């Protein structure tokens, strides 16, 4: 036996919709089920602010950071090789179809890696904190910067927020999306605006506060959330 798998059984009245989906590695039946997923867990008494980035996946208001896995970047050579093999095959041939399928499988693997990573991290963060704050980023607007678009898509920001909000509901925790304006520029100690370029990685203020740029932003994000909802315990 390689491992175990938990099975959930639902009555036919709970199944609201069934869809047949084709992926690069086969067909899947997707069932939409109406079920209460909420679970009660003990309050942790902790609150945290998260600043997502490209260098680190996120830095929190405690100064801890999670490395960026860069699944797409790490698979770029393999993807280029797969694309090249597709272009070398004659259109309409069986070999070209096989090459296209292999390319699709590679993209599918990256997509699943991203989703699982975002889900794992979000679940861990939510279960460890009673309130989680993050920036209300508009990803579509940010990726208009073509120099950063590939890195931003590879950074899982959208998936991570989606799972934070899902697990927030499931475990009865508070999730707050705050206005991202000035979170990196404002001093988390005195509130002074300290302008800096993207290449400036250290926040240095005249008040004497010197912090990693992302750490400073994460503290500001948490402060903004707490000013909105108060010091909340669930």
Question: Where is each model-derived feature located?
Answer:
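Beta-strand/loop nucleic-acid-binding surfaces
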Residues: 2-6
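Positively charged, helix-rich recognition surfaces that bind polyanionic ligands
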Residues: 8-14, 22-234
């Amino acid at each position: 036996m390689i491992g175990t798998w938990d099975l959930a059984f639902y009555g036919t009245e709970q199944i609201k919709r069934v869809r047949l989906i084709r992926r690069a590695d086969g067909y899947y039946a997707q069932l939409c089920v109406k079920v209460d997923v909420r679970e009660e867990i003990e309050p942790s008494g902790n609150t945290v602010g998260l600043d997502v980035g490209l260098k680190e996946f996120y830095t929190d208001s405690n100064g801890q950071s999670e490395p960026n896995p860069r699944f797409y970047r790490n698979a770029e050579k393999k993807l280029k090789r797969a694309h090249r093999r597709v272009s070398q095959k004659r259109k309409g041939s069986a070999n070209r179809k096989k090459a296209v399928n292999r390319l699709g499988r590679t993209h599918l693997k990256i997509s699943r890696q991203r989703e699982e990573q975002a889900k794992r991290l979000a679940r861990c963060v939510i279960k460890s904190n009673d309130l989680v704050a993050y920036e209300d980023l508009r990803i579509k607007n940010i990726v208009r910067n073509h120099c950063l678009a590939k890195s931003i898509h590879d950074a899982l920001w959208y998936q991570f927020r989606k799972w934070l909000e899902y697990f927030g509901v499931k475990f009865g925790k508070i999730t707050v999306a705050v206005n991202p304006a000035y979170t990196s520029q404002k001093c988390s100690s005195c509130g002074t605006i300290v302008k800096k370029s993207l290449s400036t990685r250290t926040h240095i203020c005249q008040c004497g506060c010197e912090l990693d740029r992302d750490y400073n932003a994460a503290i500001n994000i948490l402060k903004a959330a707490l000013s909105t909802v108060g010091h909340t315990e669930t």
